[in-house]
From Swiss-Prot:
Annotated Gene Ontology cellular component terms: Slx1-Slx4 complex
Ranges of Basic and acidic residues composition bias in the record: 281-291, 611-642
Protein name (database record): Structure-specific endonuclease subunit slx4
Organism: Aspergillus fumigatus (strain ATCC MYA-4609 / CBS 101355 / FGSC A1100 / Af293)
Family that this chain belongs to: Belongs to the SLX4 family.
Start and end residues of each stretch annotated as Disordered: 38-193, 266-312, 464-498, 579-649, 680-726
Gene name of this polypeptide: slx4
Amino acid sequence: MCTTTDVVVLSSSPDQIRSCSLANPKCGAEKAFVLSPVSSSPSFLPSSSDLFQPPTRSRFFKPGGGNEGSSRTAREESETGTKQNDLAASRKKAAVRGGRQKRTKEQPPNESQTLFDNPEPPIPKHNGCTSKKGTGSRKKRIDAASKCTKSGSKKITGKVTKPGITETTKFENKTKNVTSDVSPGKSPANKLELEKDGLQIEVAMKRRLDWTPTKDTGKQAVALDDTGDNKTRFGELLSEYGFLKAAAVSQTDSKLSDGAPTKCRRLELVDTHNPSTSKRTSPDADSDRSNVRSTRSSRAPAAEGKSKKRSRKITTLTGRVTALYTKDCTDHLDAANTMIRASEDVSSKLLSKSLDLDSCVLAPGDAVDYLQDQDLIFGTCSQLEREDSPTMLRDMQKEICASKNSMIENRKPSSTTRAGSGLYSHTTVSRFQTQRDLWSVAARDMDGSLAEIEVLDMVDITDVSELPPKPNGELPDRSEKNDEDTVSQGESSRPIEITDDFGVEVDVRMEYLATSETKPEETAYAASEIRPMPRFADWKDSDLSRQVRLYGFKPMKNRRKMIEVLERCWKAQHSSTRTGVQYAPGKPDDGSTGKAGTIGSQMNKQSSKMDAAEKMRRESACLKEKAKSSTALEDKLSHATDRSSQMLTKSSFAHMEEIEDSEDEVIPSPSQLQSLYKRHISESRSSHPLPVSDTPSTPSSRTRTNADSDTKPSPSDSATESSLPDLASQITKAVRLQPRSFSVDCKRPSWHEKILMYDPIILEDFATWLNIEGLGLVHEDREVSAEFVRQWCESNGICCGFRKNSRRSER
């Protein structure tokens, strides 16, 4: 009965393990470790557990089922029936029966291999390390053995083998725990070979010694024992890392209790932390809660007001001061008013504290008023310490502002008075109207203040009294004049010495001055006055091309050709209107080359006799003008003011932008030029003026053509040349009085600009310009050569040089 119950409880795999007789073990403990397989291959070698299956099976698996019970009963009956046989025969029979039963079973080869690998475990160590299951099975095995001994007569031998059985069961219990899960079954081939060939114990010992040392097997046995215990530990580790419900619930509970790590939860925790502190501070939990809330609500607006005050940007003294000079100065006043209103909303306690602390600080409005009353003075410490009276400084500022306003208001009347007196139609430079360019920013007026030069288009203006061109770009039409009037102008045109407050002599042409001196027959030509030929050389390229298109020609790229074509067209157009008095065959006013002069001389060959008579009249008129007294000049000036007061006159430096160089001492500034004018006037005995007008003389004022070159100078001319000023100074004045180039790209700079830019001056070109146009600006009839121009350039430190192909011929 006990055996059946044991089989039901402890059998985990009954198909693999069969029960054997427990009473008669065939081998002792000494033979358990000496068995070896017959074949050389380790796969067919049986293990010690195969040889001693009855004790090992009784230790790990309880004998269960009817098979084991029937085998026991049969064995007991055979033992009772064959008492005559000796102990050896009974043991052989039991071994044969056990072998037959083992053949029907299937054992895995892995089990035999693992047991063969570890055949010699340290038995004394396992005695102390046996598990509870092993001890329980040991007790049951002892009970079964005692029952068998009671039933059998010769159970003394069983007692002898009990200690060996217990030792083997301990060893096999340890090995079965490892190999039971690995080996699915045993093969019966090992037992068949073992019965045929025997055990071969000595050979097995050699193989076992060569196979594994004893020390290593002992350590491996300990490791196997530990692995059996580590099974549960590894399972516990997996339970910690596994997704078990209990572990997940515990983790979620701990997280919920501590608070989730999200930002929203943290913000909620921070918000809910304040009421806890307020509850701690409140003395009564229920009665004073309403009072605490009311006090919080009352303190909340005050705290908000404080925070707003702190967050507001502090206005500094520098900001207050500079705000007065900006356009949005009223914004600061509004900000001050808002600050006052915000301060009124604060509670009385806060106001009292602030007043006690800041009693010496003014209110924002009073501070702004105080700043407005102050006078800001900019200067060094020494400059500010000179005057201590604030009223004097305030009066000084008022006077400065008044003087500026008066200068702006009186600018136009002064220009009209100067125009009436024949000095300036405008000031030398005007105030800033619009910012133009770098040169105008660097320009300065007579007082030394920065100003912008007012530039007029002097394209078609030959007389001082004529109006400037219209703003729409149209060229002004001249009033028709008689050729005889032009001749009279040439006879009587001489600069008049006029000194203003600055002592500047200006060349003023008197159109009606010759009427009192000319003969009555010359006035008859005034009715047939024609317009003089305009100065095409002073026109812009765009105006020249437009005028050429008006005459029906195609636009030309060469500027000189356009000027020649326009001159011929103009002469052909106005030749029919002439009444017998031809134009003077002098140098053309456009500044063209000698070719243009020859063209004009060829057109006027028919009137060569008339030209000679006109020349004689001009010489006589010049002598008469020089002999006149100053009273006659004053009468002429009074007669001229009536005419010139109605028209704007051109100043000497009006349309020239002064390009001054700090190191250029050769070319004088306007103020230096004025002093030179005074000096030359005082030195000259003949009272010959030094004209500074930028407008050239009339065409009849100079006779420097091929026809005039043949004539010999008269004694009167030689007498006047001795009293003329230095020719070098005349060249300097002519260079400074040359009009600026009006081209946009400045491809045609003036001689003055070339000198300032240190461009090399070609002496031949410079001498040609002086003889044709330059000296005519200063009313100089003398001519200069290239060698004289070279001396003038070298004396003034100007870079100059001859042309390569014409230097030898010039010398």
